[in-house]
């Protein structure tokens, strides 16, 4: 698996077509996870630093996205799902059904690795009941 941490809006924008194609194959598809919704939310309501994590298989196909951002509250760095504050329901990681465990493992390795943004808390709000995220 190839993992990339994205912090620039231009890189976020470049994912549009691949993002929605992945969402069609996702374990938990949701309007609130579509590229248009996520990008619009970030543009108008997002604050902090983007920390999107993309995961690609060995052939370069996008198989996972952790749509995260980092903000600071009371001096502590928190990672949250894009859309987590105000308006959005049914948020989650976007994971191709063929690769659930390897994608989650790759995301966790990225978040706990030396190049990860510093954080002490993760806010995974509005997860649907069908999400595999809490179990993994």
Task: Identify the meaning behind each predicted range.
Residues 1-136:
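N-acyltransferase acceptor-side catalytic subdomain
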């Amino acid at each position: 698996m190839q993992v990339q941490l994205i912090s620039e809006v231009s890189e976020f924008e470049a994912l549009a077509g691949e993002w929605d194609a992945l969402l069609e194959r996702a374990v938990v598809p949701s309007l609130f996870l579509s590229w248009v919704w996520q990008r619009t939310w970030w543009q108008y309501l997002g604050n902090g630093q983007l920390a999107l994590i993309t995961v690609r298989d060995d052939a370069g196909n996008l198989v996972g996205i952790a749509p995260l951002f980092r903000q600071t509250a009371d001096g502590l760095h928190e990672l949250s799902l894009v859309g987590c504050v105000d308006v959005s329901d049914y948020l989650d990681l976007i994971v191709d059904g063929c690769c659930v465990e390897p994608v989650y493992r790759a995301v966790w390795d990225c978040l706990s690795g030396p190049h990860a943004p510093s954080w002490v808390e993760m806010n995974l709000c509005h997860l649907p009941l069908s999400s595999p995220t809490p179990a993994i």
